[in-house]
Each structure stands twice: as structure tokens, then as C-alpha cells.
């Protein structure tokens, strides 16, 4: 698996965590098996007795759908921003003024 594939898989895992409740059972099952369980398209197709192409199309469409949810809701983006702020806060625990600025940044994200 290349670096870009790994980054995409990691992103899809996060998007799946945030948006899985908005997906149908079928969409949820396919994404979970493909991205979380590392099943191949053929293995998923065999599991659900459908064609490999049907699985591919469903995963691609569902991936596009969760990306669209992310564009509108920005849950993953805000999660990443909060995580970066928390990391910076840990570095400045002895500086109350800086901590207060980070707290304001966190409040602004909400």
C-alpha cells in the first residue's frame, strides 16, 4: 500500500467514524469491510453475492457521499483542528496566557 493509499484509508476511517450513522446498512457494511477490515473487492462481492463492479461502484459512491457530508458539516476538519490545538496546549502548560488563547481558539471552532 502506497503512502497516498494509506492517507486515503486513514481519512476514510475517520470519515466513516463521523458519518456512519448517516449511511444505509449496505453502505456501512461495504465501507467497514473495505477500509476497516481490509477486505478486497472480490471478498466483499463473494460475501454479499454481488459482482466486484457493484461493490466498487458502491464504495466509490459512498466515499463521495461521506466526502460531501464532510464538506458540509466539517466534523473531521474541526476534529483535526482541535487535536492540533490540544497538542500545542500541552507544550505551553506553564504559560497561562497562551493557554487562554488556545481555549479561545477551541471555543471559536464550536
From Swiss-Prot:
Domain of life: Bacteria
Pfam families for this protein: UPF0122
InterPro entries cross-referenced by the UniProt entry: RNA_pol_sigma_r3/r4-like (IPR013324), UPF0122 (IPR007394), UPF0122_fam_protein (IPR054831), WH-like_DNA-bd_sf (IPR036388)
SUPFAM superfamilies: Sigma3 and sigma4 domains of RNA polymerase sigma factors
Role, per record: Might take part in the signal recognition particle (SRP) pathway. This is inferred from the conservation of its genetic proximity to ftsY/ffh. May be a regulatory protein.
Family designation: Belongs to the UPF0122 family.
Name listed for the protein in its UniProt record: UPF0122 protein SAR1212
Organism: Staphylococcus aureus (strain MRSA252)
Amino acid at each position: 500500500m502506497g503512502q497516498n493509499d494509506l492517507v486515503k484509508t486513514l481519512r476514510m476511517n475517520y470519515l466513516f467514524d463521523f458519518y456512519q450513522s448517516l449511511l444505509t446498512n449496505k453502505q456501512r457494511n461495504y465501507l467497514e469491510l473495505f477500509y476497516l477490515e481490509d477486505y478486497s473487492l472480490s471478498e466483499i462481492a463473494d460475501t454479499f453475492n454481488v459482482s466486484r463492479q457493484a461493490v466498487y461502484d458502491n464504495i466509490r459512491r459512498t466515499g463521495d457521499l461521506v466526502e460531501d457530508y464532510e464538506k458540509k458539516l466539517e466534523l473531521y476538519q474541526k476534529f483535526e483542528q482541535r487535536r492540533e490545538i490540544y497538542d500545542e496546549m500541552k507544550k505551553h502548560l506553564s504559560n497561562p496566557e497562551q493557554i487562554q488563547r488556545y481555549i479561545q481558539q477551541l471555543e471559536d471552532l464550536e
